[in-house]
């Protein structure tokens, strides 16, 4: 007909026909089931302060972000927030610190492929806003993605003949990419708090 037709991308979402409010929960890599997730927040003595039921496909960190503001409005005297490693994300650390509370979270090891350099081996220069690789080459800021991560990339000319290339990237274009959340400094502060001597008993 010669008419222009606008095509829109669709997203396939699995939904329970008997209970549409639940979510698809992943039990490992292969097992899946429709379920709910339940989060309980207690004080230091084990008394329940707050609880939340959410669809099983919601990550614990997303559930926490929703209920945290309600929690501190109801219990203004809260000074410290102690969570497990699954909550050690930049947005949560930012949320706790900007509310005037102190986060206590165990250090979360970076998930890196075996044989590759760890992220901490790339030094971030806050003043120049660049990363410096183990071969002392610069990775410059490229863009910020929708998830709130700043993307840094190397110059392929620096990487082509680098003796550490196989431990750095498998990119066919010889480009190393590192991401840094816009609130990464808050997570770094939380990591610093976690290694203080007075924090260890907690």
Please describe what each predicted stretch is.
Residues 1-202:
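Anion-binding and metal-coordination hotspots
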């Amino acid at each position: 007909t010669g008419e222009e037709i606008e095509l829109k991308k669709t997203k396939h979402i699995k939904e329970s026909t008997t209970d549409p409010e639940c979510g698809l929960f992943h039990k490992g890599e292969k097992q899946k089931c429709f379920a709910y997730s339940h989060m309980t927040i207690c004080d230091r003595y084990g008394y329940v302060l707050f609880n939340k039921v959410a669809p099983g496909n919601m990550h614990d960190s997303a559930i926490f972000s929703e209920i945290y503001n309600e929690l501190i409005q109801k219990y203004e005297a809260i000074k410290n927030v102690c969570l497990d490693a699954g909550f050690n994300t930049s947005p949560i650390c930012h949320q706790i610190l900007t509310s005037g509370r102190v986060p206590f979270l165990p250090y979360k090891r970076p998930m890196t492929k075996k044989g590759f350099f760890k992220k901490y081996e790339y030094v971030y220069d806050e003043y120049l806003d660049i990363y410096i690789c183990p071969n002392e080459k610069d990775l410059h800021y490229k863009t910020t993605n929708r998830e709130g991560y700043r993307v840094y990339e190397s110059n392929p000319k620096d990487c082509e003949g680098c003796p550490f290339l196989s431990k750095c990237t498998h990119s066919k274009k010889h480009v190393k990419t590192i991401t840094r959340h816009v609130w990464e400094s808050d997570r770094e502060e939380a990591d610093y708090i976690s290694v203080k001597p007075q924090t260890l008993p907690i």
